[in-house]
């Protein structure tokens, strides 16, 4: 797992975040080298030797886990463990929304109704935008509707281009967020975005 939180059992006293034994923390799950060109310019997400917890290295599905001290973030008092575990999907969704410059009143098409896509839809609506969530799995879309997502499209049952054209009055989506990682979905972003619109991957 890479969406995890825990209690610090041991940590160097001189860590940069001022974390102490007993603190509740979330982790930055993306382990980067710190030396390659992307790392040197602050784009650690593009590290040439990037390792992701739970994907490339063992993650948080264990009672104890060792992680670099400078990649721990203290969580506030009163935050539940369940809320803390959502820090990673929330930050990814927020980053995509911010990078795309989403504004209130705009339409945001989000491809993929997994954790990132669902949170992105809720964030878009919290910003006052209209979220349009696309997926092939009806159960995910039903769950999205139960969370209050304004529009859902089952891409396997209806034409997303025509449906988004209908929803937006012909303008198409002002921002398209691709949250599935599937090659056909990445290509489809170009069909869903408005003229002068933005795509975030």
Question: Predicted segment positions?
Answer:
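Glycine-rich beta-strand-centered segment in the early N-terminal region that forms part
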Residues: 1-37, 76-78
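Residue-level marker of beta-strand positions
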Residues: 3-7, 24, 38, 64, ...
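Conserved beta-strand positions in the Rossmann-like core of class I SAM-dependent methyltransferases
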Residues: 9, 132, 200
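Receiver (REC) domain switch-region micro-motif
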Residues: 25, 108, 172, 176
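NAD(P)H dinucleotide-binding glycine-rich loop of Rossmann-like/cofactor-binding domains
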Residues: 31-111
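Mid-domain Rossmann-like dinucleotide-binding core that forms the NAD(H)/NADP(H) cofactor-binding site
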Residues: 79-158, 162
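Glycine-rich cofactor phosphate-binding loops and adjacent beta1-alpha1 units
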Residues: 100, 142, 147-201
């Amino acid at each position: 797992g890479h969406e995890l939180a825990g209690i610090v059992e041991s940590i160097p006293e001189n860590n940069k975040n001022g974390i102490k034994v007993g603190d509740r923390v979330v982790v930055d799950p993306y382990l980067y080298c710190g030396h390659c060109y992307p790392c040197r310019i602050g784009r650690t997400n593009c590290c040439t030797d990037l390792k992701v917890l739970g994907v490339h290295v063992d993650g948080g599905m264990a009672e104890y886990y060792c992680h670099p001290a400078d990649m721990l973030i203290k969580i506030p008092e009163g935050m539940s463990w369940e809320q803390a575990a959502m820090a990673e999907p929330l930050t990814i969704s927020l980053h995509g929304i911010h990078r795309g410059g989403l504004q209130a009143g705009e339409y945001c098409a989000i491809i993929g109704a997994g954790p990132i896509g669902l949170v992105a839809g809720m964030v878009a609506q919290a910003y006052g935008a209209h979220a349009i969530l696309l997926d092939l799995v009806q159960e995910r879309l039903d769950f999205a509707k139960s969370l209050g997502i304004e529009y859902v499209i089952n891409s396997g049952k209806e034409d997303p281009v025509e449906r988004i054209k209908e929803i937006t009055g012909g303008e198409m989506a002002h921002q398209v967020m691709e949250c599935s990682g599937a090659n056909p979905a990445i290509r489809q972003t170009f069909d869903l975005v408005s003229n002068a619109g933005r795509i975030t991957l």
